[in-house]
Amino acid sequence: MDLRRIMETVNMIDNENLDLRTTTMGISLLDCIDSDSDRACQKIYDKITTKAENLVKVARELETEYGIPIANKRITVTPISLIAAASGDSDYVKYAVTLDKAAKAVGVDLIGGFSALVHKGYQNGDRVLIKSIPQALKETERVCSSVNVGSTRSGINMDAVKEMGQIVIENEKINPLNNGNLVIFCNAVEDNPFMAGGFHGVGESDVALNVGVSGPGVVKTALEKVKGESMDVVAETIKQTAFKVTRMGQLVGQEASKRLGVDFGIVDLSLAPTPAQGDSVANILEEIGLESVGTHGTTAALAMLNDAVKKGGIMACSHVGGLSGAFIPESEDAGMIAAAEKGILTVDKLEAMTAVCSVGLDMIAVPGDTPAETISAMIADEAAIGMINNKTTAVRVIPVPGKDVGDSIEFGGLFGYAPIMPVHKESSAAMINRGGRIPAPVHSFKN
């Protein structure tokens, strides 16, 4: 291999915050279903601790051998609403506690899949699981929860949208930080390696390894070398950089899955920022030519970034999937935090940006007195963008008790901190309380 390219990669890791954001093992729990919940939980614990026994060990071996940092080791499982429904239990907290114990036993950072898919309606297990979310997140440390409330083919379940607004407020009363582990989706994907929205879909193999790459710092550094060039050159530079980053993800993912004896799933092409300086998606947009993220032109710059990352990534990897785009979490990106503190970046602008990027309103801190119906309306808006544009959108919103615009909340670690962002005071309650379903769009009829 060209020595220059090797040195380039070494420099990316040492100076530009390049890492693999996550190696995530997806495990099917369909063979753990049992009408006795105690037996089911034992089967779940046994399967996870057997299949993922060496996940952390192998990841650390690969870090040492290749010199590539792997920031997180995670697990996703089949949505628990499907697994627990056979039990007839009135709450599923014990399933969440079992997942937490298994995650700690194998040493992973997070485990996702305390989830329900209700985009067209509820089965009984979905209702029980959703009502269990606040207590489940209270009693666990590493469990992540997600609920899919809409899809392009099914429309939006507005009853579920209303309920999830209430669940967010219930979480706030217990511990507002618990909402960092809850994502409400439209068009959720089955092979997402990122948290908190990851779960292992029923169409997946028994066990699969999915990889999520990082690399905003690498992209920004590459763009610093093409100042003043046309947008064609900017897009091409991003493409070439994304190719290199994704190649690394494919290499580690395939080698890890081989050593673990499991299927290699996908590489998720998402640019995932962290609060560290130089690891920001917002800074990339500013390098493209914006004085601050959030000003006019932000959506166009983000659209180009997202598309160029995908074009570069799909050439580098045989299987791409997950969310695959730029993440724009408020609290996990130093540039986003700075723009939000100045009032340049607003919830409305973030909503517009989600129409062209990977996820949605992510890690948004809002005033503690925000009504449940307003949270539900934010979820509905994001779900509508996802439904109409045939893409994944999501909401991870954090109302903070006793805080208002001008205050901030410290999450710590990977979650960083977030200034409280203003939301509209005008009520959406009458619309949210209608319930029912928003029908699927006309262009969803593809057959």
Swiss-Prot record:
Gene3D superfamilies: 3.20.70.20. Pfam families: DUF711. InterPro entries: UPF0210. It comes from the Bacteria. Homodimer. HAMAP family: UPF0210 (MF_01221). Belongs to the UPF0210 family. NCBIfam families: PRK05313.1. This is UPF0210 protein LBUL_0934. The lineage of its organism: Bacteria, Bacillati, Bacillota, Bacilli, Lactobacillales.
